[in-house]
Amino acid sequence: MEIVKSRFKRVCVFCGSSSGKRECYSDAATDLAQELVTRRLNLVYGGGSIGLMGLVSQAVHEAGGHVLGIIPRTLMDKEITGETYGEVIAVADMHERKAEMARHSDCFIALPGGYGTLEELLEVIAWAQLGIHDKPVGLLNVDGYYNYLLTFIDKAVDDGFIKPSQRHIFVSAPNAKELVQKLEAYKPVNDGVIAKSRWEVEKKVQQPQQQQQVVFCSNTSMQTEIAL
């Protein structure tokens, strides 16, 4: 397998805890995993072992890539069944899950998914719009799955709710290879955003007490608990 050099180290993938009704979604998850491995990129994801989450994490892990899953303790019984792959960090809630996924990642990719995937995607886009981060965000538009979302965003631009320049805060493509190429070439949109340094200073001033995390290191069932 030919290795392709990347400017990233860790990619956060948002995706469904369901596999969807069509095989193209599972194929896209497997293709994305292969693209990550080809570029020696580590995977950060929502920690589940079911649906597209399970497929992409298994494929990356079995190909020799590093996998980090981050999941709220409350969801562990629902989203983890059987084997897990790589390292899994249990956190307190959904807010901490998203914050930790963002902190551990250099860019973001959304596969098809439901409300949760959409919420995660739109939040990191909003963070980019506000200048909280300047990391690339990519939408894997498998067989037109996100066409209506893209149409909605175009409508928001046309009606003056999103600046035309900020329409390009994220990129989209129909396949993993093209999408990752666009992410590699991405340059941050700096039109009207608040300086990232101001957010970082405010975060240090208001830094909350760190929550306890539990780490599960396993490629079978959850076996080892380490309190941090």
Swiss-Prot record:
Q: What is its EC number?
A: 3.2.2.n1
Q: Summarize how pH affects activity.
A: Optimum pH is 5.4.
GO CC term (a single one): cytosol
Can you tell which superkingdom this protein's organism belongs to? Eukaryota
Tissues expressed in: Expressed in roots and shoots. Detected in vascular tissues of roots, cotyledons, and leaves, axillary buds, immature and mature flowers, fruit abscission zones and ovules.
InterPro entries reported in the protein's UniProt record:
LOG, LOG_fam
State the protein's purpose: Cytokinin-activating enzyme working in the direct activation pathway. Phosphoribohydrolase that converts inactive cytokinin nucleotides to the biologically active free-base forms.
* Family matches, as PANTHER family: CYTOKININ RIBOSIDE 5'-MONOPHOSPHATE PHOSPHORIBOHYDROLASE LOG5, LOG FAMILY PROTEIN YJL055W
The identity of this protein, by name, is Cytokinin riboside 5'-monophosphate phosphoribohydrolase LOG5
Q: Which organism is it from?
A: Arabidopsis thaliana (Mouse-ear cress)
Gene name in the database record: LOG5
